Amino acid sequence: MEHPYLFFVKLFEALGFEHFAHTSVHIIYTWVVMALLITLGVLGARNIQIVPTKMQNFLEVLISGIEEFMVSVTGEEGRWFFPLAGTIAIFIAVSNLIGLVPGFFPPTASINTPLACAIVVFVFTHFIGIKYHGPKYIKHFLGPVWWLAPLIFPIEIIGHLARVLSLTFRLFGNMMGHESVLVILFMLGGAFFAPLPIMALGIFVAFVQAFVFFLLSVMYFAGAMEHAH
């Protein structure tokens, strides 16, 4: 089901990229989210002052809040991977929220975006495991006793691959379902008269889904740091 009107799709059509505009909507709006976040970051970091401005204060509270929550899960040892975890959390939250603006499409409502984020988390999880344990990281997949290894190993492999599917479909399913409801309401009531309760619910869902993705990612990272038993 298509959004009734997508501003940047129309822009790309006007520039002569009709095929790309219709087949890569999620890519276009991922670029929009990236541009928005980069602009916000540049504006916030341009004039850092001892007495913070409103923008600086907002960014400091947001970033420090996410970081301290993550450290409460991973411990101080996990602070170094906050830039990746925090970036994923903020990117997903903004990607979810942007779909509430008439004429915009949430990139997370396309399965490609959640899948890409999930693959990044999957790869980085095992990077952490290898970084902390080296070749001994394989023990995470072999179980507590050696003679159960032939049984435990394939189960662990399937479990880790299932994490990608879990992260992907949880985020995609919720955002696609909400987007479909919004599309119907926009068509029935007009782009600027969608019922406010649904919009409020959309804001709640956007933050909850970003938080769940972030929390699960951090838990996977923390698990990779732990020693196998």
Swiss-Prot record:
Q: Per its UniProt record, what InterPro entries does this chain match?
A: ATP_syn_F0_a_bact/chloroplast, ATP_synth_F0_asu, ATP_synth_F0_asu_AS, F0_ATP_A_sf
Q: How does it sit in the membrane?
A: Multi-pass membrane protein
- PROSITE patterns from the UniProt entry: ATPASE_A
Tell me the leader sequence span. none
* Keyword vocabulary terms for this entry: ATP synthesis, Cell inner membrane, Cell membrane, CF(0), Hydrogen ion transport, Ion transport, Membrane, Transmembrane, Transmembrane helix, Transport
Q: Name one GO cellular component term.
A: proton-transporting ATP synthase complex
Entry keyword Membrane: yes
Q: Where in the cell is it found?
A: Cell inner membrane
Location (main, coarse): membrane
Q: What Gene Ontology terms describe what this protein does at the molecular function level?
A: proton-transporting ATP synthase activity, rotational mechanism
One biological process GO term for this chain?
A: proton motive force-driven plasma membrane ATP synthesis
Q: Give the transmembrane ranges.
A: 25-45, 58-75, 81-101, 110-130, 141-161, 175-195, 196-216
Could you confirm whether the keyword Transmembrane helix appears in this record? yes
- Please report which protein family the annotation says this sequence is part of: Belongs to the ATPase A chain family.
Function summary = Key component of the proton channel; it plays a direct role in the translocation of protons across the membrane.
Question: Partners and quaternary state?
Answer: F-type ATPases have 2 components, CF(1) - the catalytic core - and CF(0) - the membrane proton channel. CF(1) has five subunits: alpha(3), beta(3), gamma(1), delta(1), epsilon(1). CF(0) has three main subunits: a(1), b(2) and c(9-12). The alpha and beta chains form an alternating ring which encloses part of the gamma chain. CF(1) is attached to CF(0) by a central stalk formed by the gamma and epsilon chains, while a peripheral stalk is formed by the delta and b chains.
Name this polypeptide is given:
ATP synthase subunit a
The organism named in the record is: Desulfosudis oleivorans (strain DSM 6200 / JCM 39069 / Hxd3)
